[in-house]
A protein has these predicted regions:
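Peptidyl-prolyl cis-trans isomerase
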Residues: 12-26, 32-468
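Bacterial Sec-dependent N-terminal signal peptides
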Residues: 1-16
């Protein structure tokens, strides 16, 4: 039951009560959040504030009905809402400093590990490739080629130029043999031992690995990368490996230990959600919107959508009572348009479905004509008006519609009946009937809720929406 009150609750408040729903106050800011969000740029059916009041009250009444039905206590509701709460709250449990500290820790551990193994080297190489089953003659040819290149380099030949011309490692050859920085354990030991033994600028004699002969030039040496050059990579590693979540869980556990016995991560997250919501109205209303939206969906499903969709007896009764609503101006054809490979199947299709319920036609035809790998008949089923289907237009409505033959199916036909004034059965317009029946159930339900619960709207506060 609705009341319009002339007395404004909390008149001097910066955020006065705009209405009460069953005794529970609704602030002006909450109403504004919902109104502005649902009337933003791009919304087609915009409402005035006064028009929106009824929609908002109906929404709140449905949520109240869901709470009275204890939907908020179900396991499925709790699981879905807590997942959403976690998405909003968990990231706020740690600061960028916490993540930075973890990144520094990972960096220092990697730096120590690499430094202990000899640091990093920056080699370039020229590879003369040898297959694992290379003959002795092939090995000798490769060795001589590598030796020849090495001797040319010792006489001042350009390493990068020779790499581009002769190296069989195409990935590095285009870069003058450069394979960037490596540490121990990143490539084969023979190669590493040679690379780490060189001085910067020095070129190795040809060395043999499982890949073939390498001539290595050392471009540089260092203990490890500077932190700033790998920081972003480490941060990506932290997210990819779930380390951020581990840090959050450690923080939650740490805080829980300072709280009364029985407190756990959920306790801490609830407290954090309350704390954040107290300082951020947008977050508060965003979480409430999700919470109430879950309740609204489930209660609407129970009271309207599922009931309308599943109660075929009620659908039929609604159709019978409102049959005039479903009349159409022009005749429709209820049946099938079909295409066959063989002329004989045109009559066979009609014989197959004649006298059978329309709802069974598709399955009957599938079993008789298309059960094996050869599809003998292609079928389009429905209720067609003029212009919906060229075969129906041509053969039923006798228009000059252009019919394009389906490849491999030269014979077109139709079977069914013309409905002149409207559908004979509710199933002919079932989707339409269900939608209309849902609307009726919705209106009846809302009317019941408006009688069951009392709500008060304060016009003076309503007049200040978005004007303060």
């Amino acid at each position: 039951a609705m009341l319009l009150s002339g007395s404004i609750a909390f008149a001097q408040n910066d955020d006065p009560t705009i209405m009460t729903i069953n005794g529970q106050p609704v602030s002006r800011s909450e109403f504004e959040y919902s109104y502005n969000k649902n009337n933003s740029e791009g919304v087609i059916d915009k409402k005035t504030v006064n028009e929106y009041v009824d929609l908002f009250v109906n929404y709140k009444l449905k949520v109240l009905a869901a709470l009275d039905a204890h939907i908020d206590t179900t396991a499925s509701f709790k699981q879905e809402f807590l997942q959403y709460r976690d998405q909003q709250v968990r990231p706020a449990m740690i600061s960028s400093g916490d993540v930075e500290a973890e990144a520094q820790k990972i960096y220092e551990e990697a730096k120590q590990r690499v430094s202990k193994s000899g640091g990093m080297v920056h080699p370039a190489h020229i590879l003369i490739r040898l297959g694992q089953k290379a003959s002795a003659a092939d090995q000798e040819t490769a060795r001589q080629k590598a030796q020849s290149i090495y001797q040319a380099l010792c006489k001042g030949g350009d390493f990068a130029g020779y790499a581009r011309k002769y190296s069989d490692d195409q990935g590095s050859a285009v870069k003058g043999g450069d394979i960037s920085w490596i540490s121990r354990g990143q490539t084969v030991k023979t190669f590493e031992d040679a690379a780490f033994s060189l001085k910067v600028g020095e070129i190795s004699k040809p060395i043999l690995s499982e890949f073939g002969y390498h001539i290595i030039k050392l471009m540089g040496k260092k203990d490890f990368y500077p932190y700033d050059s790998v920081k972003n990579d480490i941060l990506r590693f932290i997210d990819a490996k779930g380390i951020r979540e581990r840090i959050i869980n450690e923080k939650l556990d740490s805080i829980a230990r300072t709280l009364p016995a029985g407190s756990d991560r959920e306790t801490v997250l609830d407290q954090k959600a309350s704390e954040l919501s107290a300082h951020d109205k947008n977050l508060k209303y965003l979480m409430q919107e999700y919470h109430d939206g879950l309740l609204l969906y489930e209660i609407s499903n129970r009271m309207v959508w599922e009931k309308a969709a599943n109660d075929e007896q009620a659908q039929a009764a609604y159709f019978a009572k409102n049959k005039k609503k479903y009349r159409w101006e022009h005749p429709r054809f209820k049946g099938i348009a079909y295409h066959t490979k063989d002329a004989a199947d045109v009559a066979a299709v009609k014989k197959c479905v004649k006298g059978k319920p329309f709802s069974q036609w598709a399955e009957l035809l599938r079993r008789k004509f298309n059960a094996d790998s050869v599809v003998r008949v292609q079928v389009e089923e429905g209720i067609f008006k003029k212009g919906d289907h060229p075969v129906v237009d041509s053969l039923v409505f006798k228009t000059s519609a252009k019919v394009e033959k389906v490849k491999g199916y030269p014979y077109d036909a139709t079977f069914g009946k013309i409905l002149k004034k409207g559908p004979k059965e509710y199933t002919d317009v079932k989707a339409w009937v269900i939608a209309d029946y849902q609307d009726q159930l919705e209106k009846e339900w809302v009317a019941t809720l408006r009688k069951k619960y009392q709500f008060v709207v304060y016009p003076e506060v309503l007049a200040t929406v978005n004007k303060h």
